[in-house]
């Protein structure tokens, strides 16, 4: 088997309308497709799928794993999101390879603003 690429990353939501507002109005992502129980958004070359698990009788649980959203300037992007009322989980982290700032969507799914130093 050879994996060609990641087609999408999925998050669960308890409120699709609220998730739509957050991902489009706050993060500025564009909707690719939208159904009754899910929403697919374009994030660069990856699709984020936001899905209401209650539509298939499954329980909700936020994802603590996190998705790194690459931005040109982590500090500027963080300031922009903070001005829109998005709280961050601690200070911006600088490692040997990147800068990152962690936050959550309204359902508690972990996200980070991210930039590698070599890119």
Identify what each model region corresponds to.
Residues 1-2, 78, 82-119:
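Vicinal oxygen chelate
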Residues 22, 75-80:
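Short amphipathic alpha-helices within nucleic acid-binding modules
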Residues 28-33, 88-92:
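Short secondary-structure junctions
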Residues 30-62, 110-116:
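Conserved short beta-strand elements that form part of the metal-binding/catalytic scaffold
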């Amino acid at each position: 088997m050879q994996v060609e690429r990641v087609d999408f990353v999925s998050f669960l939501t308890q409120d699709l309308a609220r998730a739509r507002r957050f991902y489009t109005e706050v993060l500025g992502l564009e909707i690719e497709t939208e159904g009754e129980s899910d929403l697919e958004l374009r994030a660069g070359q990856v699709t984020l799928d936001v899905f209401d698990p209650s539509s298939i009788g499954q329980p909700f649980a936020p994802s603590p794993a996190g998705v790194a959203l690459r931005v040109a300037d982590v500090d500027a992007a963080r300031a922009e999101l903070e001005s829109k009322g998005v709280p961050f989980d601690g200070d911006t982290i600088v490692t040997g390879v990147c800068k990152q700032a962690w936050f959550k969507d309204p359902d508690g799914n972990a996200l980070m603003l991210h930039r590698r130093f070599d890119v």
